[in-house]
């Protein structure tokens, strides 16, 4: 299609929608004209462009943010002929393919209680009451603040011409030098930031407190308060007069207004704080008609002179930020950091409890809503997007409600349905809650409660996979898991009818004659799978057909018989026909196969004392899929055909039911240990996978590869074995090189003697011919002709590599993750039976035992409430030695890996590495304050304070106190994401090499759909922006790549945290992109943030993590790019110091850096310092590479060349001095100029030419080489 044709089609598919505004809502017109983002005409109309398939709801959504209409909440859109339904599309309304214009108008509706509350809530959001750190569960945990928004970035530079690289030879030791086109101001700013980074290492001043300090309150309220009045509810007498609610408003200036809400709007009444009079207040200059405002904003602006200016100031403030830095999340929660900058200000605000719109709506039935949305037809893309958007919203709303309900249970505020039972269940707002435990003995012999905990995770994991399958006849339940204080609650929507009260029968006992009331059996019961009541496995052909076609097929399950009944999933799962006639499947934990080899080795055949805590050791779905794909690929079968023919299926009941086996399950179990685990180790060692920043990063990689966390110990052992093997190979290679060096030295001595002999013999021949008066033949005057076979040419053999920078941090991070997960289980053990108020005391006590023993050797549990005596609880008997032994025991049982007895002590100078890992795993938030792990630290802190403060300071009894920390819920949910978006993205990926523009369009559509479905604040959106930045970078569109990556960072900071691996990974990408975009200052700012975050935990020193090394390497390249050699030398020296601290000064990395520093000094004519550094390299290169290696030979040439050059300079200096003592002034001047000439010539040379000069031994030879190189270029 031609470009014109495309444009025409686009024009036809787009419709101009004009919305006429009612005259009564026009307010603060001057403000509108300044701020209006859309075209507001004098006729009070708004105009937009929409695709034809757009639904009316989308127009309503746009109007809810347009400046002229955003304060309107209760209206309908209409044409001349009809009031529009939100589900209608523009195409259905116009009903004319040729028409591309639609005129609409707004019809205001009378208010009722629900709409008044919605209006007030909306207004509060727009005038600053919706703080950027609040989400649906802010009452239980504190959300992350922002740091990224405060980085003082320069604007993204537009694309410039390609940078020409300075010519260079193949010497790998020479720094790469790309000259960056930047201003002197940026060079200075860059240098300042780099020195700041250097100082943080030199003086060890990377401070945890400042590194984790964040800003909050980007959004600030424009009123002091906006609440329901204490005079509510409306008295009966006034209710019949139309009064709906009473409001109380206090402005920032202290003005107080009491407001009456009526169907037509709002007006100021005559009430005061102690007097009730809801009648309209007379205000001078305002007529009665003007006193009632349909819009509450207009009413406040009318009566408060400064309110409007406060709103303008807020809007101006927010305009300086990206919206993603302050908007509220729609389908996810904000990150809950382990270290909170400060306690949030708890300003008096009744509305937090008053204005909950749910109180004014009918009780929700999440299951009915969810299933109805799933059944919506989606014939068009727009309808698919709408369906996914609704599914995502309701999933998150369910999770929010579930968390609130679960926390009520944890705090003892919800009554159980069966208060006398140990297995208590709860029901509120059509959400069913139950404690996760083995109450009915289902896991007897399999691990009991531990197995039940594992099964709940596996059940949820299966549901997370089902959400992406478009199943029509099989239904599943919304599910959320909430962990808090050692207990776990499973929240689900109940199967319709399953919990319904069917009434009761009165029966007479045959023996006693007593009458008893017995509940009638529910008509809704298990019809397929395990019926727990009868203990039988039931068959149902219709149910089985649906399950096998829509569920089992995609999960590679094999249909099989159990007790004569044919089923297509695990016999422990259940199929229930709900009262809504839908087929529900529940209890899906055992969908995936047992890790049979692990179970047999560590549970079935293990001693009881060494047995793994449970047998619910299933393989992950990622592993099954990885194994299945490997089988399909090996067989050369087409994917769809393999699905249709049910290739490589497995029986989920194998090794779960006695006598049932499956060779494919055995193969999967072997595949995990023998193929996947070693390949992951190899990927880490070779750098194919990034070194993990922390345990979460590591586990994310393991899960992607289908590896369970129970293999963390195995991973650490394999990594240690790999490292040890490399070290052994390295040592063996060094011995071989040592022998080879001796051999070479012997050959060299012999060869030199041979040449010497040849020279002597030839000279004797020449002398004889001369004496005889004969002509000397040409062959005796030419260079000696040597036998090429006798010459040993320099080698370029690769060194024996030891991947210390990859494997050592992998081992350390794995051990820390084992420790953190071990502590999670130990804390769960001691907290599960505690009242909530005693939990902080237990946690503080355990942390003091582990980390505060140097401050207080014998800490005591802190009392929290007189009703709860902490000394009576089990945890109070703990000792440090006992706790360390328990850690070793639990780590050995759960991870098959025993941590060293001094493991915690290894981090005594960097305890927050371990504290952070415990906090993130167990749901603990600490205040960001000074903590003292020794008495000396407290004394130093005391001395640093002002004298007035110093005298009032009282030393804390322990390192940690109850007031320092908070327990927060840990949540696992479905997290509904867009399948359509993923499909668009996959299409774009396939097209990228064929049609770049089409691919980028598909990527843009995919992200737009993701944002529509999940909202802009979501991990999936951030990940897509990060990937898109990489795509644009590879296509040379660097400015766009930088913009996308910045957006990814801003999102990740809010939903994952400032120190999360996702954030650090995004920052690393951003730093490189800023460098590629010739913005060294911006790049340095990002590297500073990375280094500051990581070094505040001392991970370079304690974990051997290469992130700081990588940062210095990139900063060095940038400093060369801005032609600041001295700064480059400083960076190289710091880089070298880090390498020495980690690996010593006898490594190839050290020698390479010394050589690089020497080159840099030589380039600025500082030959003395150049010689000092370069002279250290031959010995190391000789030892590591061999005497006859190219690099070793080159380093010797450097040393000899520099030595000769320095001697030559000294001789010339001496000659100049001698001449100066006997010559006149003019002669003296000429001599000095001659003496300085070589140095001046060298100053003009690049590092590359300098090497040629030193190797050649004369400036003439250097010039010839340089000319030759330029000619080749």
From Swiss-Prot:
Assigned keywords, A-Z: Cytoplasm, Repeat, TPR repeat
Q: Which PROSITE patterns match?
A: CLU
Compartments where found: Cytoplasm
Q: Please give the InterPro entries that the UniProt record associates with this protein.
A: CLU-central, CLU_dom, CLU_N, CLU_prot, GSKIP_dom_sf, TPR-like_helical_dom_sf
Molecular function as annotated in GO: mRNA binding
Q: Where are the TPR-type repeats located?
A: 981-1013, 1022-1055, 1151-1184
One Pfam family per UniProt: CLU_N
| Entry's Gene Ontology BP terms | intracellular distribution of mitochondria; mitochondrion organization
Q: Does the keyword Cell membrane apply?
A: no
**Annotated stretches, region: Disordered:** 1217-1242, 1254-1273
Q: List the disulfide bonds.
A: none
Q: Where is the composition biased (Basic residues)?
A: 1262-1273
- Keyword presence, Cytoplasm: yes
The residue ranges of the Clu domain are 344-599
Q: TM spans, by residue?
A: none
Cellular component annotations (GO), alphabetically ordered: cytoplasm
Major subcellular location class: cytoplasm
What does this chain do?
mRNA-binding protein involved in proper cytoplasmic distribution of mitochondria.
Q: Which family does it belong to?
A: Belongs to the CLU family.
- PANTHER family given for it? CLUSTERED MITOCHONDRIA PROTEIN HOMOLOG (PTHR12601:SF6), EUKARYOTIC TRANSLATION INITIATION FACTOR 3 SUBUNIT EIF-3 (PTHR12601)
Under the subunit heading, UniProt states:
May associate with the eukaryotic translation initiation factor 3 (eIF-3) complex.
Q: What is this protein called?
A: Clustered mitochondria protein homolog
What is the originating organism of this protein? Vanderwaltozyma polyspora (strain ATCC 22028 / DSM 70294 / BCRC 21397 / CBS 2163 / NBRC 10782 / NRRL Y-8283 / UCD 57-17) (Kluyveromyces polysporus)
Gene it is expressed from: CLU1
